[in-house]
Amino acid sequence: MESCNCIEPQWPADELLMKYQYISDFFIAIAYFSIPLELIYFVKKSAVFPYRWVLVQFGAFIVLCGATHLINLWTFNMHSKTVEIVMTTAKIMTAVVSCATALMLVHIIPDLLSVKTRELFLKNKAAELDREMGLIRTQEETGRHVRMLTHEIRSTLDRHTILKTTLVELGRTLALEECALWMPTRTGLELQLSYTLRQQNPVGFTVPIHLPVINQVFSSNHAIKISPNSPIARLRPIAGKYMPGEVVGVRVPLLHLSNFQINDWPELSTKRYALMVLMLPSDSARQWHVHELELVEVVADQVAVALSHAAILEESMRARDLLMEQNVALDMARREAETAIRARNDFLAVMNHEMRTPMHAIIALSSLLQETELTPEQRLMVETVLKSSNLLATLINDVLDLSRLEDGSLQLDIGTFNLHALLREVHNLIKPIASVKKLCISLNVATDLPEYAVGDEKRLVQIILNVVGNAVKFSKEGNISITAFVAKSESLRDPRAPDFFPICGENQFYLRVQVKDSGLGINPQDIPRLFTKFAQTQPVATKNSGGSGLGLAICKRFVNLMEGHIWIDSEGPGKGCTATFVVKLGIPERSSEPKLLLMPKVPANHGQTNFSGLKVLLLDDNGVSRAVTRGLLAHLGCDVTTVSSSDELLRVVSQDYKVVFMDVCMPEVDGFEIAVRIHEKFMTRHERPLIVALTGNIDQVTKDNCTRVGMEGVVLKPVSIDKMRNVLSNLLEHRVLFEAI
């Protein structure tokens, strides 16, 4: 016993207790050894773990604790010194690792607590995101409903369809019990129930617009909850209902349509609104949500826009229908006017032909009588007859010109002519007449005025003759001056003619002709009437003046055709007057001789006057006119053969005849076709006779047709002996006669 190294236990031995401690230490050791294994397993399975060294220390601490318990199993009995040393070493190591782990946990535990805090924060954030996602889903659903409702509302532009569709779609989308629209009356003092969803209330019911609940809704941009008992919310019978559904009202702006007058639209001098009322189902706990109210507000704005578009479309359709009616009426009036113009032109053409035929006889025979031996009294009577006949012919020409000017059928005959020679010719024509009245007439032509010009020579002469003729006619004594010069651009504009906008292009100029006289003068207030057809002022319409009052009216229209302006100035009766006109003419690219244009001339002393033996063939269906024309030609020495039909003419015509006069406006006979057949009958131009149209109608169509079929000229009835002499002289000299009137 003395050699035994066993340590005597300090405590009394109790076998049972020892057994339990032994077993407990064994299982504690097993648990301590299994815990690190589990930690190592799960750490390896974890992809991210920031505290690996802590786990190593903690695992070492647990392993050492388990080792102490395991070693402690050998300490319950007698044990050796080695066991004691191992036990002591294990406890020392356990103490060191435990202290190190404890020190490490001082730094780790706050991080672990912050992880928990972050976890709570993330949970709160996730909950907030869930709420936001719910709001986004709600907004998306609201937007989808808005798009659907907007599409349905804008699928039509009929106002009634828009409003009915709005109520139906809102009722279906929001599951409403009732939905209604109150529209303002034309007076703006009441709201009228115009549309309802279920149509159980009579449409047409009105409420005053100044109710507090209506003012409350109209004063807000948002949907407002209103009492179910208010007059505008009593849309459904409430008998048997325990609790009516919530009601909201929203205003619908009626956009101001200042450019449109909608017949059944309220007067919008101030801003007006319609009222939309929406009711949730009764006897339910359902309430209005924010997104539903936003949907209602957006739909109200869309309805306002759609209603404005519908109103504009309705007015546009009304305007279109009105325009169509007006167009139909205008088209009918245009056709009637065209029919009237054609009838007038036909009447004038017939009257022109029928009047010129007897006038041709009067003038021709009177001119023939002038060639005979007459007593002074007889000559005076013949001259009076001839003068009156010429005046009547001029009147007929004026009426026809005015008619063609008014219907736009008269066109200018543009050509190159000698402007200086034209002015001298007018001066020479007027000078003998002025000399009889002891008037001194002078012509002043500016040095910078182009010698040749491009324009209608005949109409320009007609304008100047009319203006100068009036000056001679209404002047008893004194002077008449004619001044012609190029109008400067700064002097073209005239405040009396605000519609006259002179535009001078390249190779163009404005001719200004001014005729000043010391005659009777005119009241300034009467001047505008001078350019009205058939109008004469009191000082002008003197007993001896004569005239139809057409001259200046025709001149004004001719001047307008030439893109010009004409006006008259006078200080009053007895102070004379000044007539001025401006017309646009062209400048020819190179000087060239103007085409031959025969105008009425006084008997000339030069040229051929004896046509003895000249064989002439005359076609005229009118016996009197045929006999008169034959007498004129025979008096000039011509050998005349007369025919009354086209067949006879074609049978008789031959190379022996030098000139053929033919009326191209005979009934049931195409004179132009006869001219073509005459051309076909002869091989060359020198073999066939010269063909001249002798007619009472000399409009542009007739002249164009004469040129087309190859006629050498046109002569307008009536024809005097001097006119016929000039026609034959020029025809035989130049073998062409463009026109003689």
UniProtKB/Swiss-Prot annotation:
Pfam families: ETR1_N, GAF, HATPase_c, HisKA, Response_reg. Cu cation binds at C65, H69. Residues 158-307 form the GAF domain. Binds 1 copper ion per dimer. It catalyses: ATP + protein L-histidine = ADP + protein N-phospho-L-histidine. It is a multi-pass membrane protein. The modification Phosphohistidine is found at H353. Induction: Not induced by ethylene. CDD domains: HATPase_EvgS-ArcB-TorS-like, HisKA, REC_ETR-like. InterPro entries: CheY-like_superfamily (IPR011006), ETR (IPR014525), GAF (IPR003018), GAF-like_dom_sf (IPR029016), HATPase_C_sf (IPR036890), His_kinase_dom (IPR005467), HisK_dim/P_dom (IPR003661), HisK_dim/P_sf (IPR036097). GO terms for cellular component: endoplasmic reticulum membrane. It is an enzyme of class 2 (transferase). Its main location: endoplasmic reticulum. Its EC number is 2.7.13.3. Residues 350-589 form the Histidine kinase domain. GO terms for biological process: negative regulation of ethylene-activated signaling pathway. One of its GO terms (molecular function) is ATP binding. The chain crosses the membrane at residues 23-43, 53-73, 92-112. It is found in: Endoplasmic reticulum membrane. Belongs to the ethylene receptor family. This is Ethylene receptor 2. The gene is ETR2.
